[in-house]
Regions:
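Nuclease catalytic cores that cleave nucleic-acid phosphodiester bonds
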Residues: 2-11, 17-136
């Protein structure tokens, strides 16, 4: 997925979950929890990224309670107060301002979001690349 141990990876959970035709629409919170568990395992691998931020929106926010989620080690879960895309842009902008040299990768297939975060210096990959890393 990302080869740099200093990297920040920001995941558009709604977009990634929506890319799998596995019935996610029947239980958005459950689908988000499954993705969080998979990402947690990936984040804890020795060659995983330094930091993984997962942005949840809408009904998927019920996948977590509060800020502390010990079952999802290695992840920072952000529950978007409004638009998930806006929350992702805020995370990327803050990270770029804090350390302009840190590699930032956003996982999404949303063309509008890709344009917004690339303008801030982030690299983007599609959900399939992330899911291939999870499934391997």
């Amino acid at each position: 997925m990302v080869d740099d141990r200093t990297a920040l990876v920001v995941v558009d959970a709604a977009n990634v979950v929506g890319s799998r035709p596995d019935g996610w629409w029947r239980d958005r919170a459950g689908a988000a929890r499954r993705l969080l568990a998979e990402l947690s395992a990936l984040a804890q691998q020795p060659d995983g990224p330094a930091e993984v931020v997962v942005v949840l929106e809408g009904a998927a926010k019920a996948a977590v309670t509060g800020e502390a989620n010990p079952e999802f080690r290695g992840l920072h879960v952000v529950s978007a107060k409004g638009s998930g895309d806006d929350a992702i842009v805020e995370v990327v902008a803050a990270a770029a301002e804090e350390d302009g040299d840190r590699p930032i990768t956003v996982v999404t297939a949303d063309r509008g979001l890709r344009d917004r975060v690339e303008a801030l210096g982030a690299h983007t990959i599609g959900p399939r690349r992330l899911l291939d890393g999870i499934d391997s």
